C-alpha cells in the first residue's frame, strides 16, 4: 500500500510543479518568447481559440515576436486579441503579419513581475504541502486500521517528507532561475 501511495503523491507533486512551470512561461522577461502569447485567445470563426491554433509564432530577434496567421482574414482579430490580453503589448499589423515588439521592462515592472512569480511559487508550495498532508493522513488511517505497523508508518512518513522537500527545492530552483531572467537587463 505504501509504495503506490508514495508514487501517487510524487505524481501529484510533479503535476503541481508542471503547472507552476507553465505559469512561469507566461511571465514576461526581457527576452521575447512565443510562450508569452500562449494564453491569448482569439475570436476566430465564431469561437474563442488559442492563438497557436490560428497562427504560427516566431521570434526573429530578442525583443520581437512575429505572428503569421494561417488565414489573412484573422489579422485584425489576432491583433485585437493580443492588445486586449492585458500583457502590456502593442502589436502592429502590416497586412501579412502581426509584429509584437516587446518594450523594455522598467525596474518597477520587473519588481512587480518578481512579486507575481513569488505568488505563483507560494501557491505551488501550498499545493505540495497539501499533497503531503493527504499522504500522511492516508498513512495514519492505514496504521489505525492495522493495515501497516507503526514503524512502517513512520518510515513512510519520512519518505513523504523527503519527497515534499525535494519538490519544494525544485520549486525554489525554478523561481530563482525565473527571477534571474526577469531582473537581467
Swiss-Prot record:
Classification via PANTHER family: MITOCHONDRIAL RIBOSOME RECYCLING FACTOR PSEUDO 1, RIBOSOME RECYCLING FACTOR
Highest taxon, organism lineage: Bacteria
Annotated compartments: Cytoplasm
GO biological process, alphabetically ordered: cytoplasmic translational termination
Entry keyword Protein biosynthesis: yes
Function in brief: Responsible for the release of ribosomes from messenger RNA at the termination of protein biosynthesis. May increase the efficiency of translation by recycling ribosomes from one round of translation to another.
Annotated family: Belongs to the RRF family.
GO cellular component terms, semicolon-separated: cytosol
Any one Pfam family match given in the protein's UniProt record, by short name: RRF
InterPro entries for this protein: Ribosome_recyc_fac (IPR002661), Ribosome_recyc_fac_dom (IPR023584), RRF_sf (IPR036191)
Main location: cytoplasm
Listed transmembrane segments: none
Taxonomic lineage: Bacteria, Pseudomonadati, Pseudomonadota, Alphaproteobacteria, Magnetococcales
Native species: Magnetococcus marinus (strain ATCC BAA-1437 / JCM 17883 / MC-1)
GO MF term set: ribosomal large subunit binding
NCBIfam families recorded: frr (TIGR00496)
Protein name: Ribosome-recycling factor
Keywords: Cytoplasm, Protein biosynthesis
